[in-house]
Amino acid sequence: MSESNLKGRKVVLHDMCLRDGMHAKREQISVEQMVKVATALDDAGIPYLQVTHGAGLGGNSLQHGFALASNEEYIAAVASRMKQAKVSVLLIPGLGTMRELQAAYDAGARSVHVATHCTEADTAPQHIAFARKLGMDTTGFLMMSHLNDAAGIAQQGKLMESYGAQTVYVTDSAGYMLPADVTARVRALREVLNPETEIGFHGHHNLGMGIANSIAAIEAGATRIDGSVAGLGAGAGNTPLEVFAAVCERMGIETGVDLFKLMDVAEDVIVPMMDHMVRVDRESLTLGFAGVYSTFLLHAKRAAERFGVPARDILVELGRKKMIGGQEDMIQDTAMTMARERGVSAA
């Protein structure tokens, strides 16, 4: 992956720290903090930034936690301050509704990731079609993409495209993939999608591979890359966007962002907001090693405290069971069963 074969390639960066970062903050980011971060990202030239509850539209719930404000309040506050960046949202069919997407659009959102499990694209046609009807930049987002092979991802991506998705994402929700895994899936998509349909990659840094995987995605044909300034996100965080931007600049990949401003946002704005340093630790490394949905990290830690079973053991078991997003309630059940089998008394 030398400068020569990627020099001049144009890539669109999409920041996730105000949506995926909500997971790391237990959904506790204030409207004022949202605006402060978003305006700084806008000034640094980030073209897209995602603003919602960590679980997206409809995410405020007992299962996923309650944020400090509604999605509409967050979106409206941020969108009204943007000079060039577009605000995006996450929508998981079955959790978020078309009514909530309309409300997000009315508040100022202009882009949407319509997210399904990597084998369930057929749950998204109505939501994708509605997003297109609204005139939104519309992405089909295939979560936990490591659980489907390249041919399967291509098939699911073609479905997303047929519903109206303008971009299809390979989404490494568990931070499990290695560069060869990403390359195979992106190439398979590029072979079947129409030339005008873009391909994106969303990585997590649980194995420390976020940047390498994103570069592999670009080399295979991706033109959109998700990341998070200072890596603020679920698990060990998303691909750290300021580091990725620096690598792109070294390689001659054109992102259109101001690297030094992005570095300053990470150091001066995001890091002071962190409740804990988002890094590859024992548990987040286990997420990547075992292929577990990154959002499960804090849920597993809470279950470990309650039932006296190490979080790492719980995560390995969740990986063995191939648990996916939306099954958060099963984490407590799994930990309780493991504690019973081990004869451990709950706290």
From Swiss-Prot:
The protein's name in its UniProt record: 4-hydroxy-2-oxovalerate aldolase 1
Originating species: Azoarcus sp. (strain BH72)
GO biological process, one term: L-leucine biosynthetic process
UniProt-annotated binding residues for Mn(2+): D20, H202, H204
Family membership noted in the UniProt record: Belongs to the 4-hydroxy-2-oxovalerate aldolase family.
Top-rank taxon: Bacteria
Main enzyme class: lyase
Site (Transition state stabilizer): R19
Pfam families documented for this protein: DmpG_comm, HMGL-like
Annotated Pyruvate carboxyltransferase domain residues: 11-263
Protein's gene: lapG
